[in-house]
Regions:
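N-terminal Sec/SRP start-transfer signal
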Residues: 1-33
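Alpha-helical transmembrane segments
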Residues: 19, 30-56
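Peri-transmembrane interface segments
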Residues: 43, 236, 240-276
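Membrane-proximal extracellular/periplasmic loop immediately following the first transmembrane helix
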Residues: 47-127, 243, 247
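Subset-of-secretome marker
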Residues: 62-65, 87-108, 178, 198-204, ...
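Structural beta->alpha junctions
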Residues: 62-66, 190-191, 229-236
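Hydrophobic secondary-structure segments that place a key small or acidic residue at a functional site
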Residues: 120-125, 129-212
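Glycine- and charge-enriched low-complexity intrinsically disordered segments
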Residues: 205-228
């Protein structure tokens, strides 16, 4: 009788252990499934955020070093469907009367003391859409970015501002070939250029960013150095560039069209790999 009871108790105990083991395994499986679903949901949200916020687009520039992009061509591309934003740019070099440029450290270049150096001037529709800012080479430290609504406005580098005692709200004269433009400093940025500087005008510290009209007044031309466009969605970039290339009466032998789609495609592929 005692043997029968003992065997029965042992069987029950074994079933309990087996049941607990099965319960633990099922709990682990459900935890892993929930974790996988959470990761997939997180990556899906990340993908949507990346697609919504990244600056996928293309730029048009002349194939000639000193060439220009006609404003009428730039505006025709701007009005294509699915263009989310644009940024027109005009670049030149100019003098800054009464101001001292930052010297090129270790360049070995000696300028005549009677010859004033020139700063690089970039006029833009929106300063925050310039490659230096979207690529994180420059960071806005004070003030605000320039928009298409600003007139006679500029951003200056922190080092240049400190050397000349400049602060937001101050006036700054810019001269080019007898033309003069007075701008108000709206903001101060910091950072370095992508490439080493040889001349003063190559230095980020001597880079002056203005509204587009101010730079065009200095050059005496309404034409552009570069026109940049951003797609509403990364998946629309190819069709958008194809439509730009098929615009009538545009000689694409004279212009280059480059896009940054390959950079962001890798990011999206990595996210998709984790999802799968």
């Amino acid at each position: 009788m005692m043997t029968t009871i003992k065997r029965a108790w042992t069987a029950v105990a074994r079933k309990r252990r087996r049941s607990l083991t099965i319960a633990l395994i099922m709990t682990l499986i459900f935890t892993l499934l929930i974790g996988t679903l959470t990761v997939q949901q997180t990556m899906a949200q990340l993908k949507q955020s990346v697609e919504r916020n990244i600056r996928v687009g293309f730029s048009i520039a002349s194939k000639q070093p000193s060439g220009e992009v006609p404003m009428d061509i730039a505006q025709r591309v701007q009005h294509l469907d699915k263009v989310k934003a644009h940024n027109f740019q005009a670049e030149t070099t100019a003098g800054l009367p009464g101001k001292q440029l930052v010297d090129v450290a270790g360049s070995g270049v000696q300028l005549d003391s009677n010859v004033a150096g020139e700063a690089k001037v970039t006029g833009a529709t929106q300063s925050d859409l310039l490659g230096e800012f979207t690529g994180r080479f420059y960071q806005l430290e004070q003030g605000k970015h320039l928009t298409e609504h600003d007139q006679n406005a500029a951003l200056v580098h922190k080092t240049f501002a400190e050397k000349n005692g400049i602060k937001p709200g101050d006036k700054l004269d810019i001269t080019k070939d007898g033309r003069r433009v007075t701008v108000t400093v709206m903001g101060i940025f910091s950072g370095k250029g992508e490439k080493p500087a040889v001349l003063q005008s190559d230095m980020a510290e001597n880079h002056l960013i203005t509204d587009l009209a101010a730079a065009q007044q200095l050059t005496g031309s309404q034409q552009l150095t570069r026109a940049t466009y951003f797609a509403e969605n990364p998946h629309q970039l190819k069709s958008l560039t194809d439509r730009a290339k098929n615009l009538p009466n545009v000689d694409w032998q004279k212009f280059s069209l480059t896009d940054n789609g390959a950079v962001f495609a890798g990011v999206l592929q990595n996210i998709a790999g984790i999802q799968n």
